[in-house]
Amino acid sequence: MYKFTGFTEKANRALNSAIEIAENLGHTYIGSEHLLAGLLREDNGQGTALLNSKGMNIQLCETAIRRNVGVGIPTSLSPEDFTPRCKHIIEQSVTLARKENSGYIGTEHLLSAMLHEEDCLGCRILSESGISVPLLLDELSGGASGKRSYSS
């Protein structure tokens, strides 16, 4: 398991799950779709709770990944195999946590950063599943109250 410094245990598990999911699907990269699946696999993450409340789960996500990308021969990947966009999402999660003066980078920061990249495959999977990315982002950030409803 890789250690991502500054990230919570749940966020670390989600990032490592993203790597594992991409490996198992035989993909040669780790993209936003794998990050979404990694977040969904983290059963206790608050980002997962929000996604589940909207009807998204790991099975639906993995099916959508297979449909959109296909399946290859299982492979071995590392954090260097994150796509430039996914690396940007991870970097943005750090920026979001700092803006909140948070002492950690959690699953909600990863999810929020991904949702800001509306044209990524992770967001497209959510949209194709009938989930409004802008509304999800609004709910994640606390909506009009300005208070975050989900944290981990």
Language model segments and positions:
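Histone-fold recognition with a strong bias for associated Lys/Arg-rich disordered tails
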Residues: 1-152
